[in-house]
Regions:
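Structural preference for solvent-exposed beta-strand-turn elements
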Residues: 1-180
Length: 180
């Protein structure tokens, strides 16, 4: 593509669409459901920061989607912090799980806009397809056994703490000066 304008021009290189590899057709039966786009965005926004960058344990470099009849739980951990985001707003009514690579999660969360209403998700044991707006994003999942995050979080915790947000933020800023 040659783009010409008043003070010069730019030449962009491109590749014809038919030279890109086609999506592999799986022989497995694919699970398919639709969820609100804002639910996926909130789940990814709340978990992406805690994903591990250590490739020694590749399963920890992704976001674990734990899908149940009554909710979808997004989980990530870098082994120092564990984040669990549970959304019960519109459960798909099935039981499944997969680990989405963090790069794909960051791409999807950056592409979701307020105009996107729903995301259609279809997947098998190896890969997933996420369709919303004018985007079709295909990815291979990270394979392995994600650690049981439920064992780390106490079921019946008798302690409950409510703190003023501004007070807590101020204290964290002061302590941050002395942390490494």
């Amino acid at each position: 593509v040659d783009l010409r304008f008043l003070n010069g021009h730019f030449n962009f290189m491109g590749v014809p669409a038919d030279e890109y590899p086609r999506l592999a057709q799986s022989t497995e039966e694919r699970v398919e459901f639709t969820v609100p786009a804002d639910m996926v965005k909130k789940g990814l926004d709340n978990t992406c920061f805690a994903v591990s960058v250590d490739t020694v344990r590749p399963i920890m470099t992704g976001i674990y989607w734990d899908i149940h009849e009554e909710d979808i739980t997004f989980v990530s951990s870098d082994t120092h912090k564990l984040v669990r985001y549970v959304n019960r707003a519109k459960a798909p009514g099935l039981d499944a799980h997969f680990v989405m690579p963090s790069k794909v999660a960051n791409i999807i969360r950056s592409l979701i806009t307020s105009e996107d209403v729903d995301i259609r998700i279809s997947f098998d044991s190896k890969s997933g397809l996420f369709e919303f707006g004018e985007y079709f994003i295909s990815c291979l999942f990270i394979h392995g056994n994600y650690p049981d995050y439920r064992r780390v979080i106490p079921e019946n915790n008798p302690f409950n703490l409510e703190v003023d947000r501004e007070t807590l933020m101020g204290a964290l800023r002061r302590v941050n000066l002395f942390s490494s």
